[in-house]
Design a protein with these regions (language model features):
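Oxidative protein folding and maturation machinery
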Residues: 1-94, 101, 118, 129-132
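Generic structural signal for well-ordered beta-strand positions
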Residues: 94-95, 196
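Conserved redox-active cysteine motifs that mediate thiol-disulfide chemistry
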Residues: 100-101, 108-128
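Alpha/beta-hydrolase fold active-site loops
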Residues: 103-104, 184
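Hydrophobic beta-strand anchors of alpha/beta hydrolase catalytic cores
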Residues: 105-106, 138
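C-terminal structured domains
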Residues: 116, 126, 141, 172, ...
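Conserved segment of the thioredoxin-like fold in thiol-based oxidoreductases
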Residues: 131-170, 180-183
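Thiol/disulfide oxidoreductase modules built on the thioredoxin-like
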Residues: 159, 166-205
Length: 205
């Protein structure tokens, strides 16, 4: 969450962007205060870009941002997740259908990301609490590029739930398919594959 001072800066930046729809400064402020947040509010970003003039919208950065927003909207809460599959450590392809009739929390992480390690600690608590719940499952998708480091992190952090990685880093297909912008991230799915929540806290889960 934003601190009071950060919130005030964001409000000023938003006011400037909305009142200066043709200024290059608006692009800078949009990037600095909204796009670069750990969990961007894409609905707000879309609203602000809609106020921009055609000249700004034709700029490569804004054009790419609009494409990103379009991808994000495809995987917003209430939408059905697209088909994704990745191998686990044994080489078996894992997908949402591997967790049939279960609520599924997909967690995106990497061994090189300190915040992912903190998230793994929270997930261990959730797993311990829900381990016997036959209607709930966890699936970790890693952005590691080194198999040894990935396997060592799984062992070190005692990640007993299903784990997948294709060692492509940020180029792994689910990252683009699911519009993941930062780590750690998560998606909470209903048994039918509908997205019920995104980037949920331990308390919310």
């Amino acid at each position: 969450l934003s601190t009071p001072s950060e919130k005030a800066l964001e409000e000023k930046a938003e006011a400037f962007i909305n009142s200066h729809p043709s200024s290059l400064v608006s692009i800078y402020l949009l990037e600095k205060y909204f796009v670069q947040k750990p969990q961007p509010d894409f609905s707000l970003i879309k609203e602000m870009t809609e106020h921009m003039t055609g000249g700004l919208k034709d700029r490569p950065y804004v054009d790419e941002l609009l494409d990103l927003i379009q991808e994000e909207e495809k995987v917003s809460v209430g939408k059905t997740i697209p088909y994704v599959n990745l191998p686990n450590a044994k080489g078996t392809q894992i997908s949402r259908t591997s967790f049939k009739d279960k609520y599924l929390l997909i967690h995106f992480w990497a061994s090189w990301d300190p915040q992912s390690m903190e998230a793994n600690a929270a997930l261990r608590r959730i797993y311990k609490k829900e381990e016997k719940n036959k209607l709930f499952a966890l699936w970790g998708i890693s952005l590691d590029i080194d198999r040894k480091e990935w396997e060592e992190a799984i062992k070190r952090d005692t990640l007993k739930w299903e784990q997948s990685c294709d060692f492509s880093g940020w180029n792994t297909a689910p990252i683009k398919q699911l519009a993941i912008q930062a780590l750690p991230a998560n998606l909470f799915l209903s048994p039918s594959g509908k997205i019920e929540g995104k980037n949920m806290s331990e308390e919310d889960i």
